[in-house]
Swiss-Prot record:
Signal peptide feature range: 1-25
Organism: Arabidopsis thaliana
Biased composition (Basic and acidic residues): 466-491, 501-515
Family from the record: Belongs to the 7S seed storage protein family.
Region (Disordered): 457-522
All residue ranges annotated as the Cupin type-1 domain in the record: 265-421
The protein, known as: Vicilin-like seed storage protein At4g36700
InterPro entries: Cupin_1 (IPR006045), RmlC-like_jellyroll (IPR014710), RmlC_Cupin_sf (IPR011051), Seed_Storage-Functional (IPR050253)
Hydrolase recorded as keyword: no
Alphabetical list of CDD domains matching this protein: cupin_7S_vicilin-like_C, cupin_7S_vicilin-like_N
Pfam families recorded: Cupin_1 (PF00190)
């Protein structure tokens, strides 16, 4: 019989501690060197979501919230929810508990963001600001009075994603209100949790549930422009460490009571990564904004002047979800590969984008964005990756093709090395290029594709109708044949043919005559 050595419990605990330490070290090393997590980004094909496809989830005269969802959550990433939050001047978005990682960009207006994660924090936000809030934070948002320079309304776009690998409840949205958090529990639980008389809980429960967005005067009656609500309320709901009966944490209580000021990143006050007469780009990652550390989301902004193009490029590590802030343009995305799949779902695509539209491009899909000759194109992009993403360009000074062997590249394109030298050396610009009438050419091709699709759809419709008619006729013929067979079975056994009946009738008189003649003879 084989003997098994039984390790002492202390040894097992030491082994387990070692494994956990190694895992943590690898995790920290991955974060330090920005090692990407291999997985898909929640969607596998280019997407275009038009402005009228935003789904409103809340709307009053004080503001509104609309949402769209990108992807299906494959590979443990996504789905990504994009929210558009708009507040009228002097209004408040009441406290919310975040269920997901939140990265946002301020499109217009100004206000104050207050939140609690481990501490109570606050920051002023305005047009062009980028910031991030972690899951589990409790936050609320206040809009300032009308500002003729920044805009009359506070509007921001936010992306929500789940970075953790823990189980995710599909019933959970991006956030929940403090009211739902409070009164989802019974009175007895709340009374014991807060240590207050039953009457207080009953009084609060019987109050009318307020909407998510309210006028500031409803929160602070008789007081104008009160920009700091009591942080203790947020600390209470967030489960702040100050509420824990711990001596060491009590010593830091006075420090915790202070609302710390946080710093945002403003795209309009920072030096662009690239700028030319044809446009500018700026990318914000964890190196630019410390709160992005640990997030799977980065932010970029592209401004194309009239008749310009973001040169053909692809993202080696990130998917890109972009929102058009201003103007209109065309987007071209390639989906071709060496496979023989020629279905319409795998063809290259082009589409027109306008203010308020969202377009999403998966990782490694070559793309180009173009502005029209009479309009600029400005869009903010959310990139989804655990690694810093450096776009690779097809042409220009930063062309990835320049790194390849010229003879090998010439053989790939079936041209001479001299031709390759001329091809790669002609373009002196980079990243954003002049492209006069490129967008106009793309939209004309798009119109042709739409007309061709209409013709193909009509041809397919007629073919389907004809096939349906043939199948219907075949079915009716089959039913008729079955009815005839059933009627034939009902007549069984078969009747004698009429000719035999007539013959028998003729034979009967003759038989009678023969019988009579026989009787007479006898």
């Amino acid at each position: 019989m084989t003997r098994f050595a039984v390790l002492p419990l202390s040894v097992l605990l030491l082994v387990l501690l070692f494994l956990c330490t190694e895992s943590l070290a690898k995790s920290e090393e991955s974060e330090e060197y920005d090692v990407a997590v291999p997985s898909c980004c929640g969607f596998s094909s280019p997407l275009l979501i038009k402005k009228d496809q935003w789904k409103p989830i809340f709307e009053t005269k004080f503001g509104q919230i609309s949402t769209v969802q990108i992807g299906n959550g494959c590979g443990g990433m996504g789905p990504y929810k994009i929210h558009s939050i708009t507040l009228e001047p002097n209004t408040i978005l009441l406290p919310l508990l975040l269920h997901s990682d939140m990265v946002f960009f301020v499109d217009s207006g100004s206000g104050i963001l207050n939140w609690v994660d481990e501490e109570a924090k606050s920051t002023e936000i305005r047009l062009g600001d980028v910031y991030r809030l972690r899951p589990g934070s409790v936050f609320y948002l206040q809009s300032k009075p009308v500002d003729i320079f920044l805009g009359t309304k506070l509007k921001l776009y936010a992306i929500f994603s789940n970075n953790d690998e823990c189980l995710h409840d599909p019933c959970f949205g991006a956030y929940s209100s403090i009211t739902d958090l409070m009164f989802g529990f019974d009175e007895t639980i709340l009374q014991s949790a807060f240590g207050v008389p039953e009457g207080i809980i009953e009084l609060m429960r019987n109050r009318t549930k307020p909407p998510l967005i309210v006028s500031e005067t409803l929160c602070t009656p008789g007081v104008a422009n009160t920009w700091q609500l009591q942080p203790r309320l947020l600390k209470l709901f967030a489960g702040s460490a100050d509420l824990v009966d711990n001596k060491k944490k009590k010593e830091k209580k006075e420090k915790k009571e202070k609302v710390k000021k946080a710093k945002t990143f403003n795209v309009f006050e920072s030096e662009p990564d690239f700028e030319s007469p044809y446009g500018r780009t700026i990318t914000i990652n964890r190196k630019d904004l410390k709160v992005l550390k640990g997030s799977m989301v980065g932010v970029s902004m592209v401004n194309l002047t009239q008749g310009s193009m973001m040169g053909p490029h692809w993202n080696p590590w990130a998917c890109e979800i972009s929102i058009v802030l201003k103007g209109a343009g065309m987007v071209r995305v390639l989906r071709s590969s060496i496979s023989s799949n020629t279905s319409s779902e795998c063809k290259n695509v082009r589409f027109k984008v306008e203010e308020g539209d969202i377009f999403a491009v998966p990782r490694l899909h070559p793309m180009a964005q173009m502005s029209f000759n009479n309009d600029s194109l400005v869009f903010v992009g959310f990139t989804t990756s655990a690694k810093n993403n450096e776009p690779q360009f097809l042409a220009g000074e930063d062309s990835a093709l320049r790194m390849l062997d010229r003879q090998v590249l010439a053989a790939s394109l079936n041209v001479s090395s001299v031709t390759i030298d001329g091809l790669l050396g002609a373009q002196k610009e980079a990243v954003i290029l002049e492209c006069h009438s490129c967008a106009e050419g793309e939209i004309e091709k798009l119109k042709v594709e739409i007309e061709r699709k209409k013709i193909d759809d009509e041809r397919k419709r007629r073919h389907d109708e004809r096939k349906k008619e043939e199948e219907e006729a075949k079915r009716e013929e089959e039913e008729r044949r079955k009815r005839e067979e059933e009627e034939e079975k009902k007549r069984w056994p078969p009747q004698q043919p009429p000719q035999e009946e007539e013959l028998r009738e003729r034979q009967l008189p003759m038989e009678k005559e023969w019988e009579m003649e026989g009787e007479e003879e006898s």
